[in-house]
C-alpha cells in the first residue's frame, strides 16, 4: 500500500482519473445508468458506483459468505483514494485482495448472539429484545452506506442492521403493545424525515436501497400513532403522506390507456393501478454475485431487464416468489415489472383513505373529497381487474398477457385487510385461504414449492397478521382464529426448542424455522416479535393477558380490528 504521506498531488490526480475511467468502463457492461461517483453531490452513491471495479472484484471473489458484508463495509478514507490505490496495486506481484480490503475498510461487526435469561416466557423474551434491536445513526461515518436518521429505531435483527420500511410497521405493532409509544413516535418521525429528504421511503436506510421503496405502510404507521396521539398525528404527517402518494403516482397525468411509467400503470379501460419498480437496472450490491449468475442463466433476456425485475421484487418485499415468475423453478424468468400486485394496490387504497381522513382533520374538505374519489376509483379497479372470477379469489394482473393471473397467494387477503373487498368476495377468499393455504403452523405464502423463501412451505408474520385482521373485518372469525392460533403455536414451539424468534416459519408443521432464499434463516426478529405480541393479546382476554401461548385453543378472539370499514364492506 502506498503510504498517505507520499501521495503527491500530481500522482494522485492521475490515479484518480485512471480509477474513474475504470469505473465507467466496468459498469458500461451492466447498465447505462452507472455514473461518475462525483457527478451527483446531492444523492449519496451506493458502493457499487462509489467503488466501481473494486466493488465488482471483491464481490466476484466471494471474499465473504454474505454479499451484504462488503456492501455494508465502511471505507477508512476517501473512496477515490482507495480506488486509486487499488488500480495501481492490483496487478502487482503478491497483491492480496482480502488484505487490501482489511486495510482500507471497516467491516460490519457480527452481532453478539443474544442469550435470554433462563425461564423467560415468550412475552418476556420479546420485551427483553426491544433494547437489543434498537439502533442509532448518530455516529455514521462519512462514507458509510448507512443513511443517518434523526431518531433511534428498531432493526429486524441478524444480517439486517438497518431499518426496513414495511418490516417496521409490524415491529411497531409490538412496540405499541409493549407500551413503547415513544419508540413508535420516533420511528414514524424517521420515516417522515426520509420522505422529506428523498420524496419517498427507501427500502431501507442504506445508499444501495435509494433506488426503490417497499410496500407503502406509512399510512398504517400514522394511523397507529393516532391511537395514542389522536388526530393531531394525521395533521402533523399530512404533508409526508401527500409526498409519498406523489411518489407512487408520478407520471400518471401523462399516461395514455395501455401505458406504464415507473410505478404507475393505466389499463386499456383507463383504470389506474400501480406496480413495483426500481429505478436502477444493475445487480443489487447486497446480492451482486447471485444477480449476475441469475442473469447469465437466461441469455435470451437482456441482463438489465432481469436485474430490474429482481430489484423490483425486492421492492415488493417478496424476494423471491413464484408469484413473479413464469417458471417457478427458474428465477431468471422473473418479470415483476409486468405484474400489477393486488397487495400494493390495496395498500395504496388505504393511503388514499388516510389522506382523505387527514385532509378532513386539517379542515380541507375539498381535498378530502378528492382523495375519497381516488380511493373509490381504485377500489372499483381492484374489483374489476384484480379479482379472478373463475377461481374465486383476488390475484395479480398480468400486463404482458392482459389478463388476471390464476395463482392464489397470501396477498389475496390484502383487500380484506384494508376493507376494500365486497362481502361475498371476502367469504370466497376466506374459503380459498382455508382450503389451499392454511397449514398446521399457519398460513402458507403460496401453495408452490419453488425453493424461494416467499413460497411454500414458509409462512411470514406480516402475512399472518394481514390475514387474521382482514378475515375479522368480514366476520370470518373462525378462520381468523385458526390462522392466529396455528401460527402462534408454531412460534411457541420454536421458541421452546431454540429460545428465539425467527424471520419466517415452516408452516407445514409446528416448531420449525423456514428456509429457502438467498441467505440463512435470521433470528431476532422484528416483525415476528411484533405480530406475536399482538396475537397473544388477541387470543387472551384483556383482564387476563397471557405471557405464552395457551395449551388449548381459545373459543374466540378477544379483540377486533379498530379500522372503520369502508363502503365496500357495507
UniProtKB/Swiss-Prot annotation:
<dbReference type="GO" id="GO:0004555">
    <property type="term" value="F:alpha,alpha-trehalase activity"/>
</dbReference>
<keyword id="KW-0574">Periplasm</keyword>
<dbReference type="InterPro" id="IPR012341">
    <property type="entry name" value="6hp_glycosidase-like_sf"/>
</dbReference>
<dbReference type="Pfam" id="PF01204">
    <property type="entry name" value="Trehalase"/>
</dbReference>
<feature type="signal peptide">
    <location>
        <begin position="1"/>
        <end position="34"/>
    </location>
</feature>
<feature type="binding site">
    <location>
        <position position="518"/>
    </location>
    <ligand>
        <name>substrate</name>
    </ligand>
</feature>
<feature type="active site" description="Proton donor/acceptor">
    <location>
        <position position="319"/>
    </location>
</feature>
<dbReference type="InterPro" id="IPR008928">
    <property type="entry name" value="6-hairpin_glycosidase_sf"/>
</dbReference>
<feature type="compositionally biased region" description="Low complexity">
    <location>
        <begin position="554"/>
        <end position="570"/>
    </location>
</feature>
<comment type="similarity">
    <text>Belongs to the glycosyl hydrolase 37 family.</text>
</comment>
<dbReference type="InterPro" id="IPR018232">
    <property type="entry name" value="Glyco_hydro_37_CS"/>
</dbReference>
<feature type="binding site">
    <location>
        <begin position="284"/>
        <end position="286"/>
    </location>
    <ligand>
        <name>substrate</name>
    </ligand>
</feature>
<feature type="region of interest" description="Disordered">
    <location>
        <begin position="544"/>
        <end position="570"/>
    </location>
</feature>
<feature type="binding site">
    <location>
        <begin position="166"/>
        <end position="167"/>
    </location>
    <ligand>
        <name>substrate</name>
    </ligand>
</feature>
<feature type="binding site">
    <location>
        <begin position="212"/>
        <end position="214"/>
    </location>
    <ligand>
        <name>substrate</name>
    </ligand>
</feature>
<dbReference type="GO" id="GO:0042597">
    <property type="term" value="C:periplasmic space"/>
</dbReference>
<dbReference type="GO" id="GO:0005993">
    <property type="term" value="P:trehalose catabolic process"/>
</dbReference>
<feature type="binding site">
    <location>
        <position position="203"/>
    </location>
    <ligand>
        <name>substrate</name>
    </ligand>
</feature>
<keyword id="KW-0378">Hydrolase</keyword>
<keyword id="KW-0732">Signal</keyword>
<feature type="binding site">
    <location>
        <position position="317"/>
    </location>
    <ligand>
        <name>substrate</name>
    </ligand>
</feature>
<feature type="active site" description="Proton donor/acceptor">
    <location>
        <position position="503"/>
    </location>
</feature>
<dbReference type="GO" id="GO:0071474">
    <property type="term" value="P:cellular hyperosmotic response"/>
</dbReference>
<keyword id="KW-0326">Glycosidase</keyword>
<dbReference type="InterPro" id="IPR001661">
    <property type="entry name" value="Glyco_hydro_37"/>
</dbReference>
<comment type="subunit">
    <text>Monomer.</text>
</comment>
<feature type="binding site">
    <location>
        <position position="159"/>
    </location>
    <ligand>
        <name>substrate</name>
    </ligand>
</feature>
<protein>
    <recommendedName>
        <fullName>Putative periplasmic trehalase</fullName>
        <ecNumber>3.2.1.28</ecNumber>
    </recommendedName>
</protein>
<dbReference type="InterPro" id="IPR023720">
    <property type="entry name" value="Trehalase_periplasmic"/>
</dbReference>
<comment type="function">
    <text>Provides the cells with the ability to utilize trehalose at high osmolarity by splitting it into glucose molecules that can subsequently be taken up by the phosphotransferase-mediated uptake system.</text>
</comment>
Amino acid at each position: 500500500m502506498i503510504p498517505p504521506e507520499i501521495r503527491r498531488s500530481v500522482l494522485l490526480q492521475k490515479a484518480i482519473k485512471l480509477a474513474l475511467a475504470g469505473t465507467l468502463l466496468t459498469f458500461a457492461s451492466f447498465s447505462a445508468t452507472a455514473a461518475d461517483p462525483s457527478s451527483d453531490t446531492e444523492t449519496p452513491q451506493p458502493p457499487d458506483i462509489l467503488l466501481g471495479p473494486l466493488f465488482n472484484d471483491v464481490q466476484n471473489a466471494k471474499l465473504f459468505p454474505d454479499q451484504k458484508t462488503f456492501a455494508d463495509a465502511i471505507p477508512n478514507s476517501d473512496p477515490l483514494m482507495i480506488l486509486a490505490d487499488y488500480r495501481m496495486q492490483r496487478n502487482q506481484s503478491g497483491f492480496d485482495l482480502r488484505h487490501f480490503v482489511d486495510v482500507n475498510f471497516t467491516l460490519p461487526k457480527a452481532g453478539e448472539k443474544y442469550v435470554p435469561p433462563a425461564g423467560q416466557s415468550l412475552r418476556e423474551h420479546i420485551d427483553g429484545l426491544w433494547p437489543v434491536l434498537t439502533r442509532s445513526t448518530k455516529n455514521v461515518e462519512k462514507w458509510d452506506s448507512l443513511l443517518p436518521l434523526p431518531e433511534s429505531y428498531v432493526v429486524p435483527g441478524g444480517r439486517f442492521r438497518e431499518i426496513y420500511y414495511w418490516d417496521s410497521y409490524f415491529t411497531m405493532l409490538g412496540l405499541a403493545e409493549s407500551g413503547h409509544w415513544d419508540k413508535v413516535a420516533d420511528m414514524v418521525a424517521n420515516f417522515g424525515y426520509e420522505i422529506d429528504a428523498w420524496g419517498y421511503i427507501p427500502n431501507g436506510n442504506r445508499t444501495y436501497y435509494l433506488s426503490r421503496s417497499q410496500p407503502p405502510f406509512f399510512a398504517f404507521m400514522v394511523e397507529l400513532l393516532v391511537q395514542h396521539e389522536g388526530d393531531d398525528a394525521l395533521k402533523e404527517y399530512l404533508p409526508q403522506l401527500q409526498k409519498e402518494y406523489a411518489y407512487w403516482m408520478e407520471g400518471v397525468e401523462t399516461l395514455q390507456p395501455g401505458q406504464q411509467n415507473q410505478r404507475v400503470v393505466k389499463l386499456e379501460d383507463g383504470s389506474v393501478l400501480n406496480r413495483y419498480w426500481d429505478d436502477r437496472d444493475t445487480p443489487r450490491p447486497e446480492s451482486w454475485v447471485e444477480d449476475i449468475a441469475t442473469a447469465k442463466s437466461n441469455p435470451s433476456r437482456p441482463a438489465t431487464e432481469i436485474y430490474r425485475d429482481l430489484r423490483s421484487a425486492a421492492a415488493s418485499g417478496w424476494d423471491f416468489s413464484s408469484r413473479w415468475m413464469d417458471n417457478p423453478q427458474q428465477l431468471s424468468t422473473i418479470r415483476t415489472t409486468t405484474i400489477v400486485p393486488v397487495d400494493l394496490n390495496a395498500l395504496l387504497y388505504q393511503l388514499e383513505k388516510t389522506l382523505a381522513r387527514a385532509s378532513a382533520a386539517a379542515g380541507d374538505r375539498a381535498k378530502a373529497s378528492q382523495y375519497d374519489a381516488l380511493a373509490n376509483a381504485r377500489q372499483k379497479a381492484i374489483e374489476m381487474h384484480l379479482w379472478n372470477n373463475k377461481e374465486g379469489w383476488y390475484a395479480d394482473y398480468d400486463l404482458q398477457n392482459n389478463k388476471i393471473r390464476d395463482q392464489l397467494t397470501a396477498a389475496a387477503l390484502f383487500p380484506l385487510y384494508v376493507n376494500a373487498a365486497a362481502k361475498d368476495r371476502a367469504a370466497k377468499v376466506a374459503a380459498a385461504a382455508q382450503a389451499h393455504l392454511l397449514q398446521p403452523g399457519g398460513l402458507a405464502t403460496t401453495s408452490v414449492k419453488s425453493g424461494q423463501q416467499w413460497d411454500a412451505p414458509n409462512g411470514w408474520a406480516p402475512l399472518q397478521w394481514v390475514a387474521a385482521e382482514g378475515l375479522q373485518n368480514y366476520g370470518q372469525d373462525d378462520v381468523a382464529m385458526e390462522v392466529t392460533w396455528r401460527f402462534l403455536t408454531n412460534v411457541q414451539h420454536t421458541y421452546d426448542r431454540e429460545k428465539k424468534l425467527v424471520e419466517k416459519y415452516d408452516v407445514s408443521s409446528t416448531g420449525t424455522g423456514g428456509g429457502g432464499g438467498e441467505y440463512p434463516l435470521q433470528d431476532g426478529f422484528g416483525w415476528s416479535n411484533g405480530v406475536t405480541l399482538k396475537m397473544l393479546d388477541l387470543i387472551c382476554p384483556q383482564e387476563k393477558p397471557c405471557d405464552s401461548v395457551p395449551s388449548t385453543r381459545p373459543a374466540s378472539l378477544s379483540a377486533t380490528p379498530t379500522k372503520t370499514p369502508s363502503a365496500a364492506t357495507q
